[in-house]
């Protein structure tokens, strides 16, 4: 997984969301969702790569 990958992330309150990885650091994977106003910080177990760049 790397920056720019299209991913599906499983969230606690909003279900599964599609988004793009914008940063990976020790806090987790930062994702910019397509149809949600806030960025998501997720653990690796909650993220599935759909399209790798």
Question: Can you annotate each of these PLM segments?
Answer:
Residues 2-53:
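Basic/aromatic-rich interaction segments and small domains that mediate binding to polyanionic partners
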């Amino acid at each position: 997984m790397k920056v720019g990958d299209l991913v599906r992330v499983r969230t606690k309150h909003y279900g599964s969301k599609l988004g793009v990885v914008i940063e990976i650091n020790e806090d987790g994977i930062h994702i910019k969702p397509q149809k949600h106003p806030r960025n998501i910080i997720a653990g690796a177990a909650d993220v599935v790569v759909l399209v790798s760049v």
